[in-house]
A protein has these predicted regions:
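Central helical "cap/lid" subdomain
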Residues: 210-259
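Glycine-rich FAD pyrophosphate-binding loop
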Residues: 39-60
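Extreme N-terminal leader/targeting segments of oxidoreductases
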Residues: 1-22, 37-45, 399
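Helical element adjacent to the flavin cofactor pocket in flavoenzyme catalytic cores
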Residues: 161-218
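Dinucleotide-binding Rossmann-like beta1-alpha1 core, especially the glycine-rich loop
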Residues: 64-146, 268, 306-308
Length: 402
């Protein structure tokens, strides 16, 4: 009776070496995506991923699992379109079930101004081959019969955009899928190893200091969403980032009612239903700087009120738990990818609300940059230098909530 069942597969436990070709600080989905791409596509396997806690303990384990490409600038749409393309076959590449499913995204508009923004976004998306449709209220009703077109009697729905490629992927599965795939190829994934400093010699980053001792490196990559400014400061790099909190909650399991994601562009709230039946509710990033992951009753009350304005059936559901993650928000609501200005120190930072969606393409393009020394065209607009050169990629309208 051998060979009938798959053996349980865990990460290989390796001793922390004194040096690596590449040290990636941060065991979230972006750091692990980079490690996998370095090993799988460039043969760079002398790589260490260091996480102060456990892999996926930060934003990767706290996001709401949304994957989409309906962004709003000529730079971001191709980037997330490429990422979505990788998502579709990523499970096969990693040999891991990511619970990926394409269900669509419905973004409701309660004002003509927001509807005009969605019309413009639809035109831009279509120009880059991304399907985003504009719907009338009657078409909204057909797309989701549970939507209250009166907006709770306060904000009637005047239209919507619908993004059929909108998808979901189980975040824990993605983290472990990347980690196990990288580990199989020789990457060392170290949990519980906190980085306490960056070693700089003659203006070049040459390694890190950890609680377990110094580790030399040919290149160090920061992939610590939520704490990017702290780590970068250790290398003498100042990042234009504010760290803010983003909360969400789920209800007790409810009968299957929702397919895809339903959001309101004016109420700043979104709802989806998980595979377990929970109704998942999120809202906008809190508008102040914090490193606290403490959840608040104020968010629970306000997000519940807003969700009932668009989906009144949720009054029958009971909130079960809530949580908070940290978002590194840049001035233009776009990521920072590439060199830091310090030789040997690279950045995967400013991941805001979009880090999970972009992780496959962020890892692929950053691996290419590290392996070849050439910046892929897709991420050229997202260099740190854009803030100094006044070449920002403003996309706040697409990235405020989910």
């Amino acid at each position: 009776m051998t060979g009938l069942f798959r053996h349980r597969t865990f990460l290989r436990r390796e001793d922390l070496k004194g040096s690596y070709d590449v040290v990636i600080v941060g065991g979230g989905v972006n750091g692990l995506s980079l490690s996998h791409n370095l090993a799988a596509h460039h043969g760079i396997t002398d790589v260490a991923v260091l996480d102060a806690n456990y892999i996926g303990s930060g934003g990767s384990g706290r996001n709401t699992q949304v994957v989409r490409a309906n962004y709003n600038t000529p730079e971001t749409v191709p980037l997330y379109k490429a990422s979505l393309g990788i998502w579709r076959t990523l499970g096969q590449e990693l040999d891991f079930n990511l619970l990926f499913s394409t269900q669509g995204e419905l973004d409701l508009c309660h004002t003509h101004d927001s509807l005009e923004v969605e019309r413009e976004k639809s035109l831009l998306n279509r120009a880059f081959g991304v399907q985003t449709d504009v719907l009338t209220p009657d078409e909204v009703r057909k797309a989701c019969r549970f939507v209250d077109l009166t907006g709770g009697g306060e904000l009637p729905v005047v239209g919507a955009s619908f993004h059929p490629p909108g998808s979901f992927a189980r975040h824990d599965s993605v983290v472990w899928g990347y980690a196990i795939a990288a580990s199989r190829r020789g990457v060392h994934v170290h949990e519980g190893v906190a980085v306490t400093g960056i070693e700089i010699s003659d203006g070049r980053c040459v390694g890190v200091r950890t609680e377990a001792g110094p580790v030399a490196a040919g290149r160090v990559v920061s992939a610590v969403a939520g704490h990017s400014t702290v780590l970068a400061a250790m290398a003498g790099v100042r990042l234009p980032i504010e760290t803010m909190a983003l909360q969400a909650f789920v209800t007790e399991p409810y009968r299957p009612v929702l397919e895809g994601l339903v959001s309101s562009m004016d109420l700043y709230v979104y709802v989806s239903q998980t595979a377990r039946g929970e109704l998942l509710v999120g809202a906008e990033v809190l508008p102040y700087t914090t490193y606290s992951t403490r959840s608040t009753f104020g968010f629970l009350a306000e997000a519940s009120k807003r969700s009932l304005q668009i989906l009144p059936f949720m009054a029958k559901a009971r909130a079960m738990r809530q949580w908070t993650g940290l978002c590194d928000m840049t001035p233009d609501s776009s990521p920072i990818l590439g060199d830091s200005g310090v030789d040997g120190f690279s950045l995967m930072a400013g991941m805001g609300t979009w880090g999970f969606k972009g992780a496959p393409i962020f890892g692929q393009t950053m691996a290419e940059l590290i392996a070849t020394g050439r910046t892929p065209a897709l991420i050229e607009p997202f260099a740190l230098s854009r803030f100094r050169l006044d070449r920002m990629v403003p996309d706040a309208a697409s990235a405020g909530t989910h």
